[in-house]
From Swiss-Prot:
Function: Gamma subunit of a guanine nucleotide-binding protein (G protein). G proteins are involved as modulators or transducers in various transmembrane signaling systems. The beta and gamma chains are required for the GTPase activity, for replacement of GDP by GTP, and for G protein-effector interaction. Involved in the determination of the cAMP level according to nutritional conditions, most probably as a regulator of cAMP phosphodiesterase. Required for the control of pseudohyphal and haploid invasive growth.
Record's protein name: Heterotrimeric G protein gamma subunit GPG1
Subunit structure: G proteins are composed of 3 units, alpha, beta and gamma. GPG1 interacts with the beta subunits GBP1 and GPB2.
Keyword vocabulary terms for this entry: Cytoplasm, Transducer
Induction description: By heat.
Compartment(s) of residence: Cytoplasm
Keyword Cytoplasm: yes
Keyword Repeat tagged: no
Biological-process GO terms, alphabetical: invasive growth in response to glucose limitation; negative regulation of amyloid fibril formation; signal transduction
Gene Ontology CC terms: cytoplasm
Superkingdom as given in the UniProt entry: Eukaryota
Disulfide bonds: none
Length: 126
């Protein structure tokens, strides 16, 4: 996680260090969004995989799985948009490191794609 104390400002002689509050806020918000979307994708993928490993009754599966897959698709698209948005923005000249979050997001997107490909009619889900 990112903390204000992580910012190292070089103060010139006699000048107080200044922090660009908006950059810190932007980074913090972006970091939170990445963590949230990774968690949501992980949870939804686990729920979908649960139906594949331990099938419920046909009625439960027929009523729950389609809406769960639709929600997973929506979250996957949201994650992809967020990924593209973050890559396109200039975070800061302070070189904030979010590579670990990108790696986690990429792993969850791959896992989600693999999960969606297990189901028939996958062309409708991909």
């Amino acid at each position: 996680m990112f903390y204000l104390s992580d910012i190292e400002e070089e103060a010139s002689a006699g000048a107080e260090p200044t922090y660009n509050f908006w950059e810190v806020l932007l980074f913090s918000n972006t970091q939170e969004n990445l963590v949230t979307v990774v968690g949501e994708l992980h949870t939804l993928t686990d729920r979908v995989v649960h139906y594949k490993i331990e099938p419920e009754s046909r009625e439960v599966t027929a009523t729950t799985l389609p809406s769960l897959l639709a929600l997973l698709l929506e979250k996957r698209n949201q994650a992809r948009r967020l990924y593209r948005d973050v890559l396109s923005m200039k975070m800061s000249e302070l070189d904030w490191d979010i590579d670990d979050l990108f790696t986690q997001l990429q792993e969850e997107l791959t896992r989600t794609d693999d999960t969606l490909s297990m189901y028939p009619r996958r062309r409708f889900y991909h």
